[in-house]
């Protein structure tokens, strides 16, 4: 009996190809078909037929690809690859509402082991185990019967391809206009179709990565210090905090009814309520905000081999340090001193390869004490990175309850999820306030300033969307509107003639974006170069002209 159960089932090659094509094109594209139903109401027989034609086209395309690969004996490995990739894509699309594109592939490549571990849930392991790994094993386990005639096998496979091509042509003849209209008006639909979404996105990512080895493009070689901010006994020190996944609408400084920024509310900061990000993922936003390119003209491939604002500041003679607690600077700090403080794995600060952001201050006091010239310190925080929001703050910052203490955030109630996310912002508030107090402690030696700017926002289940990374054109504002604030010491305001009341009024009426960071940092640190754009410098219009 057992022997009979363990006996490998056998199919002829054509049947195996059809079965594999059906599973890949239909079973692993449920997410795609669900999204089609949202965009194509089945309110007429015509629309019903259009919808029913889509599985036919998907099946036919996969059938053609697998059949062609069988002539090179690649049908098994290719089918297994499609199954594994399709199962993974479908899980993340259906669970988190993401889109598979180049940015998402970059996010996957840049994901740290700790972040990968945070995504692992029993649901994920079971889903991928059954729909991916088990299905691939079955595809390999099924025995393909040897063809009785090689010519007959070739003819049958040729006929199989021909029938599939004819089906595609028939659908095109009947419904081309419907397809063109549907996909033109819903451009992101195709990014849910597996396995083409993963293949196209991976190739796009690879094409961009190839350009990373191009010669470095230097900018700001004319950089020099403004005489007003140089050769003074009191040096200048600026801290820039790069936030992670903090969305503006949950900042109490932005009018959010919950008190998520109790400390910063007392710090006399200037908050900019209308600030847009350059992207919806760290891999896009961080290199973009440090580049001289505005979002509308941002080129990822150029940013990978071009200097940014930190290079210019360093060239002008200012000491630059980047402390990282978020898996890397995405190229923004490659040519300035930088350190991965997460790797220190400090006790009471780190859990499973991830650390609370307070680790960023390790050794900072000593660094500042030994600093002889002007300095810019960048603190790259892990902030509110999900889905393990509950791991982003120590227990004493669990202000709002009940919380979502799991990485299966889709299983939590809205209240639990928002509570946990808001707790991360309470800890962000603590971190930024701590940096301000650190600067205050060194005001005897330095004229100090601080900027906080988050890389992108976050979705917390609104409209079934979680996390971030959606294409900018369709991403909700919660992923694009980010908190930005500025703190200037009284000494800075007086010494460099900056009117803070003017800044406060300007912040409430003007719209800003991460495009402003480049020139604002140059202006804040007194670096002059032809790349500086006064119109993008937030402080420029509020500087009083000395009589």
Curated annotation (Swiss-Prot):
Q: Cite the InterPro entries for this sequence.
A: Alkaline_phosphatase_core_sf, EptA-like_N, PEA_transferase, Sulfatase_N
Major location (coarse)? membrane
GO MF annotations, alphabetized: phosphotransferase activity, phosphate group as acceptor
Q: Name one GO cellular component term.
A: plasma membrane
Transmembrane regions listed in the UniProt entry: 10-30, 48-68, 80-100, 124-144, 155-175
Tell me its EC number(s), please: 2.7.-.-
Topological region Cytoplasmic: 1-9, 69-79, 145-154
Q: Does the keyword Lipid biosynthesis apply?
A: yes
Q: What class of enzyme is it?
A: transferase
Q: Where in the cell is it found?
A: Cell inner membrane
Q: Which residues lie on this side of the membrane: Periplasmic?
A: 31-47, 101-123, 176-547
- The answer, when asked if rRNA-binding is one of the entry's keywords, is no
* Induction pattern: The eptA-basRS operon is positively autoregulated by BasR under high iron or aluminum concentration conditions.
Q: Name the GO terms of the biological process aspect.
A: lipid A biosynthetic process; lipopolysaccharide biosynthetic process; lipopolysaccharide core region biosynthetic process; response to antibiotic
Look up and give the membrane topology term. Answer: Multi-pass membrane protein
Q: Which UniProt keywords apply?
A: Antibiotic resistance, Cell inner membrane, Cell membrane, Lipid A biosynthesis, Lipid biosynthesis, Lipid metabolism, Lipopolysaccharide biosynthesis, Membrane, Transferase, Transmembrane, Transmembrane helix
Q: Which domain of life is it from?
A: Bacteria
Q: How does it assemble?
A: Has been isolated as a 91 kDa complex containing ZipA-EptA and an unidentified 24 kDa protein.
Family named by the database record: Belongs to the phosphoethanolamine transferase family. EptA subfamily.
Q: Briefly state the protein's biological role.
A: Catalyzes the addition of a phosphoethanolamine moiety to the lipid A. The phosphoethanolamine modification is required for resistance to polymyxin.
Alphabetized NCBIfam families for the sequence: P_eth_NH2_trans, PRK11598.1
What is the designated name of this protein?
Phosphoethanolamine transferase EptA
Lineage of the native species? Bacteria, Pseudomonadati, Pseudomonadota, Gammaproteobacteria, Enterobacterales
